[in-house]
């Protein structure tokens, strides 16, 4: 299996890349700047928005860890999903894209999105809203085999790989036994690679919780 990883040297993408290589997958890593995360990766220095459909013809899966960053135009997060559609429509390739906790409902009543709550950080609100708009675009598509993987409210960069995670498929946040909505970067990366290997959760928005 060959996968294209967008943002292959970032916080999430480097973890996805490492785990994919450990599974014996080939990795084509797209990076905007910086260095390769591993000498075994076929590196392409290019922005997501400059990728062409033709250069992905040898890839079975695209895993995107793209994020605009906090200081860029939040609308880039919406536009990223439109780019995913352009790159993957009618290819049969499995698109697995990072979403955002803000695009999930707060609970099973499905009345309020997380980004709409007072607790949601102001600097993330427009980013989260645009991610949700992008996911809405995918949900209207019948030409793309997609999965959107949303972190929990606390996306923990330091918790490490526990290997024990829960997946939610109902569109709302999950909470552990301590009442926390938390996932580590490593566990979410593991979930993405598992989904790629198993070709699972097609056309679903899911969330991942570290148990």
Language-model features: where?
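A conserved pocket-lining segment of Rossmann-fold NAD(P)-dependent short-chain dehydrogenase/reductase
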Residues: 166-183
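Glycine/proline-rich active-site loop of Rossmann-fold NAD(P)-dependent oxidoreductases
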Residues: 141-142, 156-164, 195-204
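Substrate-positioning beta->alpha
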Residues: 130, 179-193, 204
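Glycine-/Pro-rich loop/turn segments that contact NAD(P) or position catalytic residues
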Residues: 72-160
């Amino acid at each position: 299996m060959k996968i294209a990883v967008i943002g292959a040297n970032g916080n999430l993408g480097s973890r996805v890349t490492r785990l994919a290589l450990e599974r014996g997958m080939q990795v084509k890593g797209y990076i905007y700047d910086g260095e390769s995360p591993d000498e075994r990766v076929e590196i392409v220095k290019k922005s997501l928005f400059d990728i062409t459909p033709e250069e992905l013809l040898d890839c079975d899966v695209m895993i995107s860890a793209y994020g605009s960053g906090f200081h860029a135009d939040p609308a880039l997060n919406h536009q990223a999903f439109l780019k995913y559609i352009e790159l993957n429509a009618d290819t049969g390739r499995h698109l697995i894209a990072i979403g955002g906790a803000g695009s999930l409902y707060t609970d099973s009543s499905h009345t309020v999105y997380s980004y709409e709550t007072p607790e949601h950080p102001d600097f993330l609100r427009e980013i989260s809203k645009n991610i949700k708009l992008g996911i809405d675009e995918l949900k209207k598509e019948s030409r793309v085999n997609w999965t959107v993987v949303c972190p929990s409210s606390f996306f923990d960069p330091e918790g490490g790989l526990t290997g024990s995670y829960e997946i939610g498929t109902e569109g709302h946040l999950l909470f552990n036994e301590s009442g926390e909505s938390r996932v580590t970067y490593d566990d979410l990366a593991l979930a993405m690679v598992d989904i790629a290997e198993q070709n699972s959760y097609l056309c679903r928005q899911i969330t991942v919780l570290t148990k």
